[in-house]
Structure formats: structure tokens, C-alpha cells
């Protein structure tokens, strides 16, 4: 009697999360750039329409970065975490997952 195997759906979700987590650095960089453009527009008193567009771009970039950060958390937990809540809770208590959770919540 060994450890239960994750479902095929859990495996698919895990692969998708690993792929998204791999782009986390690029997405964080894009969010930094979007924030910089937004702040520069505010500093130079740009028209409201431009500031709004840049704010929406920043929001989209931060949302993508946050999704990637939470995907990294789920990827660190592993595919069994999608099916087994006890396994997930145990993994959530590890330092690596704590660090990833803190990064995601910081966004």
C-alpha cells in the first residue's frame, strides 16, 4: 500500500502550473516596467486617459505576476496536492512553500 497516485486532471493542472511558474520572472519584470511607466505618467501629469490606460496595464501585469506566483506555490506542493487536501496542508507548512506564499501575497 503506497502513496496514492494523482489523477490525470491533477497532473494536467500541475504541468500548467509548472509552465506558468517558469514565466514568473518575466511576468514580474513586465509588472515592474508597467509600474515604472505608470509612475512616470503620474509624475509628468499626463492626461487622465493615458494614466488610466497605464493603470489598467499595470493591473493586468500584476494580476499575471500574482497568478504565476501562486502557480509556483502549487507547483512546489506537487500534483498530489490538487487531489489530497491533507497532503496539501502538510506541504503548505514547509519553508519553501511559505516563501512562495509570502511572495505571492506581497503582490
Residue ranges and their predicted role:
Residues 7-28, 40:
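Short, charge/polar-rich alpha-helical segments
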Residues 1-5:
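N-terminal acidic, proline/glycine-rich, low-complexity intrinsically disordered segments
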Residues 48-59:
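Short, charged, amphipathic alpha-helical segments
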Residues 77-107:
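Amphipathic alpha-helical binding modules
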Residues 23-34, 62:
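Short amphipathic alpha-helical heptad-repeat segments
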Residues 57-77:
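Amphipathic alpha-helical coiled-coil segments
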